[in-house]
């Protein structure tokens, strides 16, 4: 029998599908990545083609192994991590989606959310799912598909349709339709899963008019769900043994498995998660209570705050404003000036996430004077990422009663030393950047590897989490508070835009 030397993480993100191959020492041996189409049918709507998601993801798996000359029988397990909340509904007989995947960023169900609030469901949903009633989560997206796609409601009632977040869709496709599962972390993002009983909530399903028969079976984040065949007939069968939503996978990859440990992922959006262990902490500050992975992939509780526009605001500087030609240039231009010259950018392009939850706020630049140049705007845009992170972290510390000793960071923007230092200064907290910043993939790989005995346990993995650099805060308190007050004022301006609009109508 061939020695199994590798674990593969499939990282299905918002803009690209990736495959990351790790060896036993948790070193990255090979990476393959493919972007796929972003579909914007109308303002505020975002979709993906589920078939393209599967095609790009399966081809990166083959590519990553091929690049490194790794045979499929050398792979011990596959772990999956995915963009969360994004919703796929498909016909189980034909295997075809009835509609495009509705992406987490999509705001089309805002009116459905308003209607559910009017029906008095808000507090029940909050208490039992840990989430706020917002278009972000899967529940209203499924309802929209059933209500708006011709024939979907009838097929659903007849038991022909299945729902899945992206992990569920990939596993179903990879096992030729044999396995319809998700894990606790992804289930907890649907707004349909009761985090007290750890079951699908039949009251919410009934209120949304979604048949229980559509829902996947919910399992731990680290166990063998099924096997996939690589290399066609007579190929190798490899266990799919780990699933976690991208943010929970990153939390696990950062080894935040104990209560009070927290991380921030700077991706398209920013996502802060704090593990609260077996204690369900209810937020009074606009955060979500959600499920994360305990030490062995069993469900644990966490607090989460989502910032919708993190790296996406740097892309906006590049693609729409054309102030930079490469996202990496943002640090260079931001450091050409000493301050943002009184400018604040509030990148509320799709509303504001935690702790504000204002779907109607819009992007705003305030404090413009004649002396402001493009470098100030670039700097203020980077600073907005750090300010939004502080908004969330302040709320987390208030809810949990835990003062954070250090923040672990990951994601594309952590390569930006200016942003990391400014983040430490704004928070007055050390920021730790790990050597391996692919922590989302690491988390999925760890969960899969542990399930099949590729690694013995957490102690072995914790020895692999090395820090590349610690950023220590070095600002005086008066300056910190003054700047942050200015940010809070700027946010009020972004929120006032919609309020004033409503008053005029």
UniProtKB/Swiss-Prot annotation:
Keywords (A to Z) from UniProt: ATP-binding, Glycerol metabolism, Kinase, Nucleotide-binding, Transferase
Residue positions binding sn-glycerol 3-phosphate: 14, 84-85, 136, 246
Binding site for glycerol: 84-85, 136, 246-247
Regulation: Inhibited by fructose 1,6-bisphosphate (FBP).
EC main group: transferase
One Gene Ontology biological process: glycerol-3-phosphate metabolic process
CDD domains in alphabetical order: ASKHA_NBD_FGGY_GK
Pathway assigned in UniProt: Polyol metabolism; glycerol degradation via glycerol kinase pathway; sn-glycerol 3-phosphate from glycerol: step 1/1
Gene Ontology cellular-component annotations: cytosol
InterPro entries linked: ATPase_NBD, Carb_kinase_FGGY, Carb_kinase_FGGY_CS, FGGY_C, FGGY_N, Glycerol_kin
Binding-site residues, ADP: 14, 18, 268, 311, 412, 416
Protein family per UniProt: Belongs to the FGGY kinase family.
Function: Key enzyme in the regulation of glycerol uptake and metabolism. Catalyzes the phosphorylation of glycerol to yield sn-glycerol 3-phosphate.
PANTHER family on file: GLYCEROL KINASE (PTHR10196:SF69), SUGAR KINASE (PTHR10196)
Protein name from the UniProt record: Glycerol kinase
Gene source species: Vibrio cholerae serotype O1 (strain ATCC 39315 / El Tor Inaba N16961)
Gene name as annotated: glpK
């Amino acid at each position: 029998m061939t020695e199994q030397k590798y674990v593969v993480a499939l990282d299905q993100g918002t803009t690209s599908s990736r495959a990351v191959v790790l060896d036993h020492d948790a070193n990255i041996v090979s990476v393959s990545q493919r972007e796929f189409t972003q579909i914007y049918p109308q303002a505020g709507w975002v979709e993906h083609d589920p078939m393209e998601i599967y095609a790009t993801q399966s081809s990166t798996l083959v590519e990553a192994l091929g690049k490194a000359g790794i045979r499929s029988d050398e792979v011990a397990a596959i772990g999956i991590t995915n963009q969360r909340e994004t919703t796929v509904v498909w016909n189980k007989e034909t295997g075809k989606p009835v509609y495009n995947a509705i992406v987490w960023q999509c705001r089309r169900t805002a009116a459905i959310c308003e209607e559910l609030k009017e029906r008095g469901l808000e507090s029940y949903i909050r208490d039992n799912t840990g989430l706020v009633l917002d278009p972000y989560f899967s529940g209203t997206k499924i309802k929209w598909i059933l209500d708006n796609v011709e024939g979907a409601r009838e097929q659903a009632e007849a038991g022909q349709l299945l729902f899945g977040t992206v992990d569920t869709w990939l596993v179903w496709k990879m096992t030729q339709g044999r396995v319809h599962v998700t894990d606790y972390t992804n289930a907890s993002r649907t707004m349909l899963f009761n985090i007290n009983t750890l079951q699908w909530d039949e009251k919410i399903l009934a209120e949304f008019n979604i048949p229980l028969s559509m829902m996947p079976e919910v399992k731990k984040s680290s166990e063998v769900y099924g096997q996939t065949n690589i290399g066609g007939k007579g190929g190798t069968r490899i266990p799919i043994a780990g699933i976690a939503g991208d943010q929970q996978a990153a939390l696990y990859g950062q080894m935040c498995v104990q209560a009070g440990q927290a991380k921030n992922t700077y991706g398209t959006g920013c996502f802060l998660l704090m593990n609260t262990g077996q204690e369900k902490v209810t937020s009074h500050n606009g955060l979500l209570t959600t499920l994360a992975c305990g030490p062995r992939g069993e469900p644990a509780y966490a607090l989460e705050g989502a910032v919708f526009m993190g790296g996406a605001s740097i892309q906006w500087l590049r693609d729409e404003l054309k102030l930079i030609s490469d996202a990496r240039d943002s640090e260079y231009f931001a450091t050409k000036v000493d301050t943002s010259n009184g400018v604040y950018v509030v990148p509320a392009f799709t509303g504001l996430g935690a702790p504000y939850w204002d779907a109607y706020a819009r992007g705003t630049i305030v404090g413009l004077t004649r002396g402001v140049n493009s470098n100030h705007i670039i700097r203020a845009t980077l600073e907005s990422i750090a300010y939004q992170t502080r908004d969330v972290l302040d709320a987390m510390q208030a809810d949990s009663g835990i003062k954070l000793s250090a923040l672990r960071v990951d994601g594309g923007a952590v390569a930006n030393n200016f942003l990391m230092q400014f983040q430490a200064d704004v928070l007055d907290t050390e920021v730790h950047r790990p050597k391996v910043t692919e922590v989302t993939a690491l988390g999925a790989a760890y969960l899969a590897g542990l399930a099949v005995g590729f690694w013995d346990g957490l102690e072995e993995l914790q020895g692999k989490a090395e820090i590349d650099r610690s950023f220590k805060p070095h600002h005086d308190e008066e300056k910190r508070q003054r700047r942050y007050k200015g940010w809070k004022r700027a946010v009020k301006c972004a929120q006032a835009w919609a309020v004033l609009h409503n008053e005029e109508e």
